[in-house]
Amino acid sequence: MSEIGSYHDTIFALSSGRLPSGVAVIRISGPKTRFVYETICQAIPEPRHAALLTFRSRNGDAIDRGLILFFPAPHSFTGEDCAEFHLHGGKAVVEKMLAVLGELPGCRIAEAGEFTRRAFANGKMDLTIAEGLADLIAAETEGQRRLAMQVASGNQRKLYSEWRQRLINARAFIEAELDFADESDVPGSVSMQVWQQLSALKHEIEHHIASGKRAAMLRDGLHVVIVGAPNAGKSSLLNFLAGRDVAIISKEAGTTRDLLEVKLDLGGIPVYVTDTAGLRETDSVVEKIGIERARARMAEADLVLSLEDMSGPVSVTVEKIEAETWLIGTKADLGGSASGLWKYHISTMTGSGLEQLLDALQAFAEAKIGQIEDAVPTRQRHINLLRATIEEIEKAIEGDDLPLELRAENMRLASQFLGRITGDVDVEEILDVIFSQFCIGK
């Protein structure tokens, strides 16, 4: 990736979806954008107005006929001169157009996320908005889309900028007391008010971090693990939840030996359900490995569904784990006298109890996530920097025996950590990581 500020070349990339398609969009950004469209279109389109033109190579051969739009700097996505070619989405058409663009001097194919990185470099967005756009592109459920839109709309940026300004103002009061301690127009000992304000800010940030766990669940998904003895109906339940045959079903015990995972969309919340090897004593080395993996996945679960065949002898045993566990009686169509032992009774043969269980899973997911309406930290990077901010605030508040100069320095560091979240202070070392998450063309 080029260094920020050294964008002397013009970049281009296919910004629309997979080919072939009805329409393909090729985006261009950089100082030679005007030269590019004048060369290919032999015309100068009016800014922000679509023009229907023929696209030609440098030797005059027609490539396609389509629309071009021009967005002059600084009022464009990247802050540079930008253009979009809208052409037919045939593979040969797009490949020819990209080849022609690549032959123009000063033009090259864009790297992943480079358009967005240029937008950041030119002050069109901060890092949290860029991350929100990445999450919006990756969103697969309605809940993920809503969360990503909150971030991409700038809610995080506004909150963190406000907190940072409060720290800067508080530090200014302390430095004023240091510089003008003998002056009559400086209020007597404003520092006590400052420490109270910092304490309130610390509690706000702590509450904000706590809400991040729910956001992480929505962004990364909840994890439900199905466990039980061999032939308890685990694979049959997984197939029902998936709506297709994911797992092999057999009367032979020990058929499932590895982890099988499906992703569900329950009310806009991503939920990953994992089928595991049957828990039992075995001499099979392969099956033992599967059982070890099952127990490891259980330890990471948000919810465990412990299945037992209701038609056989009752021997309900639950592995000792921290996650919430539901006891599920299976094969309810075959009967069972001890049905009160289980939270739910299901039969994949008749469908009995399955919709009730599915509704319960959705209710569980919704209760775990709750309503996320305010700005929340959506990435571990945010949480790490927020914790570092709190640590410096605590040092400033609790440093009664320290000189005010040192406590003011703690406040400066705290505001710097907040600034690193939004990119207001130097974050060069993490930019490649953030923008590499985008596809080429974004």
UniProtKB/Swiss-Prot annotation:
Keyword Hydrolase in record: yes
Subcellular localization: Cytoplasm
Cofactor: how bound: Binds 1 potassium ion per subunit.
Cofactors: K(+)
Disulfide bonds: none
Gene Ontology biological-process entries: tRNA methylation; tRNA wobble uridine modification
PANTHER family: TRNA MODIFICATION GTPASE GTPBP3 (PTHR42714), TRNA MODIFICATION GTPASE GTPBP3, MITOCHONDRIAL (PTHR42714:SF2)
Function noted in UniProt: Exhibits a very high intrinsic GTPase hydrolysis rate. Involved in the addition of a carboxymethylaminomethyl (cmnm) group at the wobble position (U34) of certain tRNAs, forming tRNA-cmnm(5)s(2)U34.
Subunit (UniProt): Homodimer. Heterotetramer of two MnmE and two MnmG subunits.
Protein name: tRNA modification GTPase MnmE
Native source organism of the sequence: Brucella canis (strain ATCC 23365 / NCTC 10854 / RM-666)
